[in-house]
């Protein structure tokens, strides 16, 4: 009896109870059109909880229709509904994360993004897979879930291996994903893995013809982290390129880590310039280059 009461209490408190609409779609009297109209009203009211449930119901409707071989596949629609449900939960997290039981929804967020990614991997182009992975990874990073974010991002990045050069995504699109993967690796203090990714970034940039200030800034930030790891983590593994980078740093032949500064580098005295150059830019700034990329998308 006590176990039964405890189980009922857990289901009342948990934001991830067993969803009846997932297991018995026939009892759902709302059609897809009705749910879409309902979503419009819910968005106006910022009712994220019912938006999440509505998106999940829509995904279930599309899933049930997929068994009908006479219908055209609706993979794009299914992915959209999964992403919509996940983003609604992200909004709940950001609004109510101070409540202890709200933390349990992170598992649902990762589950939904991975469901969308599973559909894309099976049925969509690799570049679409990468874009969906970026969306999920950035969202998971925004709620401080770096491990889950890295898993999603790596899945997307790995699917570009077989894509021909002329079919690859925009360079900055890929760089954003690598940047966030490297962020999650730093959070976990996996230094050697970070160094491997710096080599990957260098290899990618060597093949890129269009060089812009923003790209240069991102590369500088990555290099600054690598230098600090080489200086302060004695056991970190490094390539020949890393050794050259460290030698350049020690000879004080180090360019400013960002093109536009506040204050301008020229306004600092020589000793201040040296200090400025030798500290990690992204740890001293509220605005990182990757945030600027996302802001202007």
Curated annotation (Swiss-Prot):
In Swiss-Prot or TrEMBL terms, this protein is called Uncharacterized protein T09A5.4
Q: Give the Basic and acidic residues compositional bias ranges.
A: 19-29
Specify the domain of life of the species encoding this protein: Eukaryota
**Disordered: where is this region?**
1-29
